[in-house]
Amino acid sequence: MATFSQKPAEVVKKWVLIDAEGLVVGRLASLVANRLRGKHKATFTPHVDDGDNVIIINADKVVLTGKKYTDKKYYWHTGHPGGIKERTARQILEGRFPERVLEKAIERMIPRGPLGRRQMKNLRVNAGPNHQHEAQQPEVLDVAALNRKNKGNA
């Protein structure tokens, strides 16, 4: 019997809604990365975009454990000599785009390549409680109920 290999035409995608309020960033990011890749399905095929579409709301209310809120640094380079820049997680969460902390955590758990970039397009992260995808009738996924450690104590 040959190993099952799913074709792109056979893929069935669902829409999943996750409320990130009070959830630990890393635990939520690993669960979402697995959903985006499709690894939670028995039909997972490494070279096919088999994952679900994920909508995350309240991304500005995520929790970082330990001292990561003040100590974790996000680096980027401007491209100019000496152009290394850094911001702490606190500065980003209190800044203009607080959802980027969660986006970066998920992005860094997905393989970097053409398929990974396509899978990241199936992710929608909103800082507030609203989203524009009611028409897709997303299924609500209660991440806090999956494991007691998923809920932060902040």
Curated annotation (Swiss-Prot):
Entry's Gene Ontology molecular function annotations: mRNA binding; structural constituent of ribosome
InterPro entries documented for this protein: Ribosomal_uL13, Ribosomal_uL13_bac-type, Ribosomal_uL13_sf
GO-annotated cellular components: cytosolic large ribosomal subunit
KW Ribosomal protein (keyword) present: yes
Domain of life: Bacteria
Any one GO biological process: negative regulation of translation
Record keywords, A-Z: Ribonucleoprotein, Ribosomal protein
Function of the molecule: This protein is one of the early assembly proteins of the 50S ribosomal subunit, although it is not seen to bind rRNA by itself. It is important during the early stages of 50S assembly.
Subunit structure: Part of the 50S ribosomal subunit.
HAMAP family attached to this UniProt entry: Ribosomal_uL13
Family: Belongs to the universal ribosomal protein uL13 family.
Protein known as: Large ribosomal subunit protein uL13
Species of provenance: Brucella abortus (strain 2308)
Gene: rplM
